[in-house]
Amino acid sequence: MATETFLYTSESVNEGHPDKLCDQISDAVLDACLEQDPDSKVACETCTKTNMVMVFGEITTKANVDYEKIVRNTCRNIGFVSDDVGLDADNCKVLVNIEQQSPDIAQGVHGHLTKRPEEIGAGDQGHMFGYATDETPELMPLTHVLATKLGAKLTEVRKNGTCPWLRPDGKTQVTIEYFNDKGAMVPIRVHTVLISTQHDETVTNDEIAADLKQHVIKPVIPEKYLDEKTIFHLNPSGRFVIGGPHGDAGLTGRKIIIDTYGGWGAHGGGAFSGKDPTKVDRSGAYIVRQAAKSIVANGLARRCIVQVSYAIGVPEPLSVFVDSYGTGKIPDKEILNIVKETFDFRPGMISINLDLKRGGNNRFLKTAAYGHFGRDDADFTWEVVKPLKGGKLATA
């Protein structure tokens, strides 16, 4: 019987991409603030262009933070150690323009730190989405998982010397042929793999293609998804020597789909990096990922999306929504009731239940490259599945 299939694509960028560099600097600042003062209020933006990084925003903290040192260390650790590769961590200009959080916002959200956790209001209005699908062990879309892992592997083989010609900047993209199984997504095969990576002057395009196939694609993409029809575009522009902030300007919060679900589900538009957990752009998105993942892991649906929305200064969410795309074992209305009974969507309680005030150990820096979801790391507390009533993980 002929089955109707369709193509779907997700992209990723690795840690040397200028936008991702900015995300990582913003989250490194957040980590430093929270490590010394868990009640820090942080809204840290970063931008970069040739030979310059600027950190700006609103931060209220008791922490003693050396912003310039954080910027230089983060750039250096990524591999930006000379003008040749796109930025020189030790010699670039670092500009800092940080002010305190607006007292108007402070009184409305946390009462200048006088409110109890359950009273803390959302730091802003907005709506956030969580998504999960049973197509991978991570309960994430395979297009996104493979694009992200290719980017991480590019960085790994650059840093361990396997491919010494690699430079920090790079992008990946994966197209997969899917079958729609009554609302659930079933990957059939990888249709197209695209990698564009920064490189030095010494390497030929043929060498680039051979190394990428052998050391990046082969270890990442399971053989069962590749066939003789799979298309490979490996550095299709023909030259990518100039990269990093020298090639393109970078800005925090410009890779929000890469940070989440690769175009699947939905996105409320709010970025994550550089924001403390009173910012529901981040904490709200984390709790609805935990809810969506728990729904699928408990077998209540094969695929689902969860939305939550907030008003500034108000603790209780304005709305919670669940859609199982027709894959639910029980009606969506019942799943929604179980979600509302199980998860506390008030921002102050999200912070406690997901331990989001804990910085240090590169806790949030780790989230700022290669995705915030589907990661196997104890610091990613929102990836912990909760047993749900009527689900297969619920105790009798």
Swiss-Prot record:
K(+) binds at E45. Homotetramer. The gene is SAMS. It is an enzyme of class 2 (transferase). Pathway: Amino-acid biosynthesis; S-adenosyl-L-methionine biosynthesis; S-adenosyl-L-methionine from L-methionine: step 1/1. Binds 2 divalent ions per subunit. The metal ions interact primarily with the substrate. Can utilize magnesium, manganese or cobalt (in vitro). Catalyzes the formation of S-adenosylmethionine from methionine and ATP. The reaction comprises two steps that are both catalyzed by the same enzyme: formation of S-adenosylmethionine (AdoMet) and triphosphate, and subsequent hydrolysis of the triphosphate. This is S-adenosylmethionine synthase.
